[in-house]
Amino acid sequence: MIYQANKRQFGALEGLAHWCAEYYYTLERLGADDAEMPAIRKDVSFCMDRCDALGVPYWAQNAALAWAENWRATKAEYFDAAMAKRGITCKGGATA
């Protein structure tokens, strides 16, 4: 599948990936009982709702989440390159 997002949609996907990576980083480093976990879960939920409101397909959201679950991958590969490998691009080029 191929999905060409506009800049707002692509930015929302990037935000979703960021908070997903933050969730797994915090989970690994500090555990599920860390005081920040409820706020991080709320941020992930907000980002998912934002993607839904902007019309981002679920498979594209899932691709961003699957990439960000391995938070180390977010340190080794740029988001736009990772999404391009999964058929997700941004109209007009990467967001700056």
Show where each model-derived region lies:
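Non-transmembrane, aqueous-exposed alpha-helical and coiled segments at domain scale
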Residues: 1-96
